[in-house]
Amino acid sequence: MTAPSQVLKIRRPDDWHVHLRDGDMLKTVVPYTSEIYGRAIVMPNLASPITTVDAAIAYRQRILDAVPAGHDFTPLMTCYLTDSLDADELERGFHEGVFTAAKLYPANATTNSSHGVTSVDAIMPVLERMEKLGMPLLVHGEVTHADVDIFDREARFIDTVMEPLRQRLTTLKVVFEHITTKDAAQYVRDGNDYLAATITPQHLMFNRNDMLVGGIRPHLYCLPILKRNIHQQALRELVASGFTRAFLGTDSAPHSRHRKETSCGCAGCFNAPSALGSYAAVFEEMNALAHFEAFCSLNGPQFYGLPVNTGWVELVRDEQQVPENIALADDSLVPFLAGETVRWSVKK
């Protein structure tokens, strides 16, 4: 029996789904991502969503201004799709290298999504343009109808929105983001090379019992919501299989402590500080460390048609405690796994 690895050396990873927010929050959270990842797909759901090239350029600069000296980090900007978005504006942003992808939020599916798309038909001309451009569509895959149970929203989305869309636009590149169900895992596995998925650390590590049994744990509350154990296991098996169209997307989504620990708390896990080590722990538990680098560093660039990062990151088997909180100007952030010990940490 061989001794377990003490060091994991991988190509520098990318985060294909992150929320960096704005203002003081942005300045606080950006370094946790820029220190580790070469690139990150930045979500556009600010209070005033990023729907124009100029807005994306300005936001990108605010992000870059928050990157500490010595960090080599490139934010990849996305356009927030709305019913009224101009396809020419989207194409201009893509050709000018401002927009890497566009994001489809069903209206009111998650934080700051009230401006989202009311129906796919409303944006079909934009999606047709994206298909011609080879521009990826990033999808929050949940229906938001009041009569659909929150635990069924993803599976229903596949049947009523995702599959009809992909039948209609057969060469549109689609990333099914933060998948949470065995239905989505099977759907992506059965799909063609134009369909990929991101998976978060929390959906690999936890299920809804972890959030709800023995007291409500608001810092595990995110959208899409944690599902049953059978769904968690399906996600773990997907990544452990070495499936090449699944890749790292933390969906790190910071909210101040008082907005999480309240009678009507916000959805989102701020997992940037511990995400890479969390993924490593899952792959180790699944005896799948041979596929860890591809998930973190190779599969995403392959799908997006981008080069693999040239640098390297080392994780060491060195137990460290995640901070209980991180200071904000007028509050604090409670990170994912706060106060808990993680067995893999990034070598500084």
Swiss-Prot record:
Keywords: Hydrolase, Metal-binding, Pyrimidine biosynthesis, Zinc
UniProt keyword Metal-binding present: yes
Active site: residue positions: 251
Record field: catalytic activity: (S)-dihydroorotate + H2O = N-carbamoyl-L-aspartate + H(+)
EC identifiers of the protein: 3.5.2.3
Note on how the cofactor is bound: Binds 2 Zn(2+) ions per subunit.
PTM-bearing positions, type N6-carboxylysine: 103
Biological processes annotated in GO: 'de novo' pyrimidine nucleobase biosynthetic process; 'de novo' UMP biosynthetic process
GO molecular function annotations of the record: dihydroorotase activity; zinc ion binding
Cofactor(s) needed by this chain: Zn(2+)
Gene Ontology annotations for the cellular component aspect, listed alphabetically: cytosol
Top-level division of the source organism's lineage: Bacteria
SUPFAM superfamilies: Metallo-dependent hydrolases (SSF51556)
List of residues binding Zn(2+) 2: 103, 140, 178
Record has Transcription as a keyword: no
Binding site for substrate: 19-21, 45, 140, 223, 255, 267
Pathway annotation from the record: Pyrimidine metabolism; UMP biosynthesis via de novo pathway; (S)-dihydroorotate from bicarbonate: step 3/3
Gene3D superfamilies, per database record: Metal-dependent hydrolases
PROSITE patterns: DIHYDROOROTASE_1 (PS00482), DIHYDROOROTASE_2 (PS00483)
Residues bound to Zn(2+) 1: 17, 19, 103, 251
UniProt family annotation: Belongs to the metallo-dependent hydrolases superfamily. DHOase family. Class II DHOase subfamily.
HAMAP family noted in UniProt: PyrC_classII
Subunit structure, interactors included: Homodimer.
Function: Catalyzes the reversible cyclization of carbamoyl aspartate to dihydroorotate.
Record-given protein name: Dihydroorotase
Gene name linked to the record: pyrC
